[in-house]
A protein has these predicted regions:
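Substrate-binding clefts and catalytic carboxylate motifs of secreted carbohydrate-active enzymes
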Residues: 2-186
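Extracellular ectodomain segments of secreted/surface proteins
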Residues: 154-169, 253-276
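A structural signal for the main folded, soluble domain(s) of proteins
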Residues: 156-158, 163-167, 182-188, 217, ...
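Short beta-strand elements of extracellular/lumenal beta-sandwich folds
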Residues: 170-178, 276-289
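Terminal connector regions
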Residues: 178, 215-267, 325-337
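Short acidic, flexible loop segments centered on an aromatic residue
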Residues: 180-198, 285-303
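Intrinsically disordered, low-complexity Pro/Gly/Ser/Thr-rich segments with frequent PxxP/GP/PP motifs
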Residues: 188-190, 195-234, 301-327
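Intrinsically disordered, low-complexity Ser/Thr/Gly-rich stretches
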Residues: 247-250, 254-261, 292-318
Length: 337
């Protein structure tokens, strides 16, 4: 177990670098879906900012007795301002994404020295701030969908040792993870594309190989100079392709601490949505990449499940998302008009 992030107030960088022969409990506690928070706040659902002794602070891991609101403010504040409850929740949930996915991915690259990692944790037994990826009422947090990418049997992984790379020279190890040996005997290309805060391409590099029996393979390092990392945001998109098809996509975001809220202020693009029963097709019809694209069913977060969410869509790209409800759904994203 390791709780230096959260109980010891460690920076998120700590979780980016942690290693262990086997992982149990770790990560960052985060707020539930906003519908769930408003549900347990009851008559205080429209009160913000939070005040000492209110419902909001009581619904924390030790009922507000261990400075939990300060910890929430610290980790949420790496990403978002605290002007509104919605922004505070978003920042908290993004901190959980970073605090979990990087640790899991580093652990996978260390096989067999690291033999496993428990997914701490799936659900919860109390409505409030928690390490869970599904809150007490059943609403799914963003970390669930990012961990889907991190735990995919076939994926490309970049390792980071810090969250802020701005104006620094960096060398990022790139790994190919192929648990089921899907690429065995096949040629493949792993491409890494880096975007800045204008969503201009900074670097695009391809790593070619031929699949063997390895489940973990280091492909090399992605090197960036100070000019290339000088940006209020950097995004890294890792695609694994073989036989003319993209087989997986993983993506990362850094430098967000430069300015609170910057991650949600990227140049905008446009997404269309087409529904056929429980199958949702989302398409980027704009001229820029679409970041963090997700579908949801307003008012039904406690029932709603998507097959995948928080997608990166390049211009012209489409993805099909399966949902489990017949209720109305909508599409949102971090830079969607």
């Amino acid at each position: 177990h390791n709780y230096n992030c959260w109980w010891d107030d460690a920076h998120l960088n700590h979780n980016l670098n942690m290693t262990s022969p086997f992982w149990g409990e770790f990560g960052i506690a985060s707020l539930p879906h906003i519908e769930s928070v408003r549900r347990y706040l009851a008559e205080e659902k429209d009160r913000w900012p939070s005040r000492p002794g209110d419902h909001f602070r009581h619904h924390t891991p030790i009922f507000g007795t261990m400075g939990e609101f300060g910890k929430l403010s610290q980790y949420s504040g790496y990403f978002m301002p605290d002007t509104t409850l919605a922004e505070f929740i978003t920042g908290s949930q993004l901190a959980q994404v970073v605090g979990v996915r990087h640790t899991l991915e580093r652990a996978r690259t260390l096989w067999p020295e690291t033999t496993g990692a428990l997914y701490y944790k799936m659900n919860d037994n109390y409505p409030g701030v928690s390490w869970s990826s599904v809150d007490y009422y059943g609403a799914i947090k963003p970390v669930h969908y990012f961990v889907q990418k991190s735990f995919a049997p076939l994926t490309g992984v970049l390792l980071f040792d810090r969250t802020n790379l701005s104006s620094q020279e960096v060398s990022l190890p790139l790994y190919l993870l192929d648990d089921c040996r899907q690429l065995n005997g096949k040629d493949y290309t792993v491409s890494v594309t880096v975007y800045n805060d204008r969503l201009d391409t900074v670097v695009c590099r391809e790593f070619d190989g031929h699949g063997e029996l390895e489940t973990v393979k280091k492909l090399g390092n992605l090197n960036l100079n100070r000019a290339q990392t000088k940006s209020t945001m950097l995004f890294f998109v890792v695609d694994v392709c073989s036989e003319g098809k993209r087989l997986s996509r993983n993506y990362y975001f850094t430098n967000y601490e430069v300015r609170r809220g910057v991650i949600m202020s990227m140049p905008r693009t446009e997404i269309t949505m087409k529904r056929d029963g429980r199958q949702i097709t989302v398409t980027n019809v704009g001229k820029l990449p679409a970041i963090g694209v997700y579908v949801e069913s307003p008012g039904y977060a406690h029932e709603f499940i998507a097959s995948k969410n928080y997608l990166w869509l390049n211009p012209g790209e489409s993805q099909i998302i399966e949902v489990n409800v017949d209720y109305p759904v909508c599409v949102k994203g971090w830079n969607i008009n």
